[in-house]
From Swiss-Prot:
CC cofactor note: Binds 1 [4Fe-4S] cluster.
Protein name: Periplasmic nitrate reductase 1
EC number: 1.9.6.1
The organism of origin for this protein: Photobacterium profundum (strain SS9)
BP GO terms, sorted: cellular respiration; Mo-molybdopterin cofactor biosynthetic process; nitrate assimilation
Domain annotation 4Fe-4S Mo/W bis-MGD-type: ranges: 41-97
Amino acid sequence: MKMTRRAFVKANAAASAAAVAGITLPASAANLIVSSDETKIKWDKAPCRFCGTGCSVLVGTQNGRVVATQGDPEAPVNKGLNCIKGYFLSKIMYGKDRLQTPMLRMKNGEYNKEGDFAPVSWDQAFDVMAEKFKKALKEKGPTSVGMFGSGQWTVMEGYAASKMMKAGFRSNNIDPNARHCMASAVGGFMRTFGIDEPMGCYDDFEHADSFVLWGSNMAEMHPVLWTRITDRRLSHPHVKVNVLSTYYHRSFELADNGMIFEPQTDLAIANFIANYIIQNDAVNWDFVTKHTHFKRAETDIGYGLRDDNPLQMKAKHPNSGALHPMDFEQYKASVAEYTVEKASQMSGVSEEKLIEMAKQYADPKVKVMSLWTMGMNQHTRGVWMNSLVYNIHLLTGKISQPGNSPFSLTGQPSACGTAREVGTFSHRLPADMVVANPKHRAIAEKIWKLPDGTIPAKPGYHAVQQDRMLKDGKLNAYWVMCNNNMQAGPNINEERLPGYRNPENFIVCSDPYPTVTAQASDLILPTAMWVEKEGAYGNAERRTQAWYQQVKSQGDSKSDLWQLMEFSKRFKIEEVWGEDLLAQMPEYRGKTMYEVLFRNGQVDKFPLSEAQELNDDAKAQGFYLQKGLFEEYAAFGRGHGHDLAPYDVYHQVRGLRWPVVDGKETLWRFVEGSDPYVPEGEGFRFYGKPDGKANIIFAPFEPAPEEPDQEYDMWLCTGRVLEHWHTGTMTRRVPELYKAVPDALCFIHPDDAQKRGLRRGDEVLLESRRGEVRCRVETRGRNRPPVGLVFVPFFDARVLVNKLILDATDPLSKQTDYKKCPIKITKV
């Protein structure tokens, strides 16, 4: 779809006039298309490059550059709106320090790990890179090579990377940065329902009577979705908004019931609500009897630390995800100890506020939408917390219906579509399959035309484990793509930087800008961004969206997909597979990894003539690469509850929510009449489980691995702010966003500041047991922590706050807890 600037002026004028008159124009009337010769600006659609909301924008290009963006009025997600970051999308690709050519550490004309970065050709870059990967493979085998990817990869990039690692190099050591943000959500879905991703959709916002935010500052992190909650709340007086957080933020401004709780005690609060439902006879027995089982989680499971860490050694059942059967009476007895008095005493939230929220869940006439993001997922018991909230919805039957929706929000544009659905985690394959399951491996090997036994059965190193293995010298050739983990990951000083600078290791970073990660690497590959390539993303409501390339990449930068294709050409299949595999398929002898994986009659099935004129990746390979990868990937899910539409369809629509069966998207899963996989007469079927029943899982309160003491007497919570996204790689290069919020500040309660002799603007030293950073004090403003806690965002490369964070994870999901870390604060 192409539009001119004049079309936008007309559309906006018409829409404004209609609004004044109190009428609504159809989308087609507000999105006129006129002849492109009336202006040189061309317009086309693309999903936003930032968060997991999945807003659609209209991209204006002129003279080979993106010159403007605007909210897409035809998009059902954002309905023409953008947040402040979205309005400046046109500037993210044009930072003054945009990387234009590969850079290799050199000394005396050769690669040297202690050398300075010097520009090299792509051939030279890949020559050195291939040499290092081949050396590691030959000396230590497939487990010595790895990749750290991204929820910002396109679907096709993630699919190609996962296929290259797991089928080509035969290494499961690939993990996305979504491990840091969504792994606990995945774990909760799989344990409770046996299948990943939300059963509801954004339409729930217009149907709910009550909203409960469990650790999610939607006003800043998902602002477009927050406008829908705001509209619902202000337009319907009966609607209530409940906000749970460890500190006061902008979402509290709309809250009818705002609750500040002690870190980690959300576990007790969730169990109290379940107890309240039972004690007040609010259990939906018809639903519970037909559609659920009761289970008990194994307890005292540790904190995902190194095996020799004293905290880990104390655990009775380290890393255990075992579930034990129980009946309702046993479940009732288990939650009974979580009375309102106990929950209030533990959490610091008043009994009145807890009961007010619990009543909304218990009332069968009130439709409740629970929403959460990192506050629940970045948690050493994040999987438990996800399941505890599902328990509440399952006990009341408030699930898979308009307005009744437990909804896990995502933070990255394709954490769902790429990391989760494609399966770029170290333990996963596409469509919720896992490498540990021999039947799943056999399916993947058949689709990929591989010999039996190609895919290793053992899960690879997850994100935090990759850092540890780099440091220990067991992971030696490592490719970081589309993320800035040196700034975003935990425990930078002790566990990450030592591995990058380990002389045994060779670290590659693909990025558009010289990030902290790039500067710590040995080879930097300049990467094409966003609409400089064709791609597809999958958002938080299961909506897959595609876009065409609209401008050429800058300098000699290349897309991640191009880099994967070209690198795979550097390996003969004999260099990565053993004789046992080659003997099964001798026709592969002498071929490159590229030919075996990507010229297999499926990926290269669609001719270049089907691609748009501007598609550099397709032209480089001589076939419609993106379509071939997408269609091969889609074969995993079609007929198995993960159905995707044909690739070309996505370019004609503003996304479709899977499963897409017979051309129809699915709004609510697991419910008859909406989900084609639920048989007639069953009402509900949670078909991720063999018997179609979901698990109600009891898990108790367990403390955080570290808590404040006399020396480290404050909690530290990290996170984001409205104006910046993650580590600020893109947003800090947008002048307007940088000027709005140039620095990461230490938000602190005035009483804590006064106690330490601090005033607003003072520079302070924040110290944990792992490191220290300096920043300035803020006692006013949007974020207002309670006494005993500070909030510091992580977007600022000059304030590497994650140096302070313990690399403790949820032992089940392996996701890091960034929300609670003891520190001390002193004035500089």
